[in-house]
Amino acid sequence: MENKVLRLIHAGESSLAYLSLLSLAVFPFLDVMARHFFHTDVNNSNGYLVHLVLVTTFLGGMVTSRQKKHLTLSLELPVKEPFQAILYILVQVLCASITFAFAWSSLAFSLNGFEPGKKIGIVPLKWLLMVMVLGYLTMGIRFIFGQERIERPGLWLIPAVLLGSVIGFSSIVQVFAGSAGPPPAFLAVLQAPLQTVMTQAATPLIIVLVLSVFFGSPIFVVLGGVAYLLFAHQAAPLEIMPNQAYTMLTGYSIAAIPLFALTGFLLSEDKAGERLIKFFRALFSWFPGGLAVVAILVCAFFTTFTGASGVTILAMGGLLSYILLHGGYGKTFTIGLLTASGSIGLLFPPSLPVIIYGVTAQISVKEMFKGGILPGLALVLGMMTMGIVYAVRNDVERHRFQFREALTAFRESIWEILMPLIIFVGYFGVGAVLVKRFAVVVVFLLVLEVLICRESGTPKLLNLFFTFTPITALFFLLFHSPSPSWIVIGIAAAGSAAYGFLIAYFMDGLGADFRSVMPVFARFIALVAGLLILFAVTVKISLTLVESAAIAMIYTLIIQVVIRRDLKIRDLSKVMSKCLPIVGGVLTILSLANGLSYYLIDSDIPVKLTAWVHAVVSSKYVFLLLLNLVLIVVGCFLEIYSAILVVAPLIFPLGHVFGINPVHLGIIFLASLELGYLTPPVGLNLLLSSYRFNEPVVKVAKSTFKFLLIQLVAVLLITYLPILTTLLLKK
């Protein structure tokens, strides 16, 4: 009977989490529809949305704790039984006590943090915030009761509750003071001596807590616990922690994180990956390194949308490794390529780390995305170069280009290909400019065909149109001239001819017919450009980041469930069950790491660090080199979301002192952390790849070393050539 009740509770908990996650797309979507078709807005939709993010975070955190999937940095340290079992229990008790302290402070904040009559819709805000209390309380209990290795969990729950109550005692006093007048006398008597105890015990507890991360303590407990104990040490209000969590989670742009994450999981769980691989393989397998290029592009695509390199390695690693191994690539090369490619998409829109950095640094997220495009391409091209060089040196077999195969693959994957373009057009608002330039190009080419070539036969006309039109349009976009001059047109036409000659050279080497092969590449680009233009002309929508995320999620859901029918409605729960640990885990970390960021800033640590660095380091370039090294080390030990919240605030003032563009600093930050994922001994991608390919971490590290060097070169170029980041910022 007990197990049945527990299963019902778990099912209800999961269902509420799934519903809240799906519902995040509703309010942005309604806002878009109301604004563009009815010229109005949905009343207080942003308020509903951000508080729904709050609910999703803590419901997701509860589900994540039940699944034991909160992010950890657990190492296999040489500790033998029975000490290992004892250490495990002590770590779980410590984590539970810290989480119970969070619950006490959240309760005090919920009761006293807002005006009594404040509501979100018809729900009083203080009752809505009880989801924070419920979330922390549930996660704390599961540290004890959710562990099979703990016997008599009820016995261990008692010291966890007592220690958590001592750590959060000042919040307990605030709970009673706010809800029923003055606190009971015994609480007032205990407050002063317990505060003295916490002042003395905070430092050793912080040391123990930091060490516990190597024995399985979740990262959110360690980051939040360190901040909490630092505030307790200074006798500061402990309600700062839930206040900062609330502030972070109710920031408007944060809603894009769960929406894009769910979009990525919807894509990775059906046959979208297979279709994209088939499409890229049909287009690129005819030239040296084509299959490696396919793997890199697919990895970049999925990492961009999931925001987590681990998801790409785990979801796509098996299929991509099979294709590469059977395509003639060695096992060592394949593992190294896929491990290193797992994070190269993190600089492209709509990457979640870029969003979080922009929000944290208070920089335009759109500018961050613009700044990341060329550096991201540098990383991708570096990886592609490695693939091509390997294929040439090892004489990897190429495949003749098949027009029908490419056309079929394009038709099958068109819906997946269109999604990033729709996001790009909606968010960056390039539609109107593109239409003008495309029209000029079409007229120019028709005049060229009819008056100069004097041949208006359909086959050649279409061939010329489909071949050069989109490429010339691309050149116009790069020149970014509102009214293209004849000089610009001439340069664009020359570039088009050079492109055609290059493709013809490769195709001729394979013995292929240029006339039958060339148009397929151009038709692909032309069709995509045409659909993009049609979208821009008919809809004329300019979307916010969150609205773009909502449209992407709804679009993907419709494609995969209604049109493709790869996913059944009943299968959505499985997809969301895999997505929630990322959403709940990441947002929980962000909410608590924001408290640590607040402490660092409030204590003037960035100012002090800036003064010290400025006194020791006088050269901008030496500072940048040291920054690269520090961030690579940080990337080894901290996942990217924690690093952004904890480390980024420390470097903002340093960047200002040395005159570094804020967007450039952000791209350096993210690119260096990416490199840390590949750095031994505990780079995240190395650990995940070891798990996915069933190989020792040492062997994975050796396989990845050459790619690590290539990405190091790319990171140095990004660091010391700021034009790569700033070139597109003014466009």
Can you describe what each PLM-predicted range is?
Residues 1-78, 82-185, 540, 588:
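Alpha-helical transmembrane segments and membrane-interface helix-loop junctions
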Residues 115-117, 154-731:
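Alpha-helical transmembrane segments of multi-pass membrane transport proteins
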